[in-house]
Amino acid sequence: MTRINIDRLTEIEETQAILSLYYDARSYIEDFDWCVSTKKCWYDQGFGIYQKIGIFLFEIEPLNENVDDFIWVIVGDLPSVYLDKSILTGQEALEKYCELMQEWIDNVKNGASLDDCYPIPADPTIENAELLSSRIAFIRRELLMKDDE
């Protein structure tokens, strides 16, 4: 018999949650035609939330030289997004994520076109905009330490 160490179990559960987010992120980025495969991956632990949000930097094998070889991916309990290598840190990636989501939210609430917005795989309803808005407010307040803009 082995004694169960609850502290260690928590670490295992956290690792499993990060791995689950990683597999989601890898699957998301590898679904794009311009990503031949993923080579390496880094997880930004400072801005991730256990089972809710993961910020990853992937080194990929791009389809051609017109595609960045480093891509940020944000996944979790919110719409997935990829960002190019002009983003330098996980914090900057999360800030850009919030900007992209806020643009979609604002356009939905104002009845404006979504043609220039990052594509969000959700119906453009006020209800979905409100749900996303609450998540973005949480990210800004708790992770980025900023008030809602």
Where do the protein language model's features map onto the residues?
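Short aromatic-glycine-(Arg/Gly/Cys) micro-motifs in beta-strand/loop hairpins
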Residues: 47-82
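N-terminal "first-domain core" detector
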Residues: 1-48
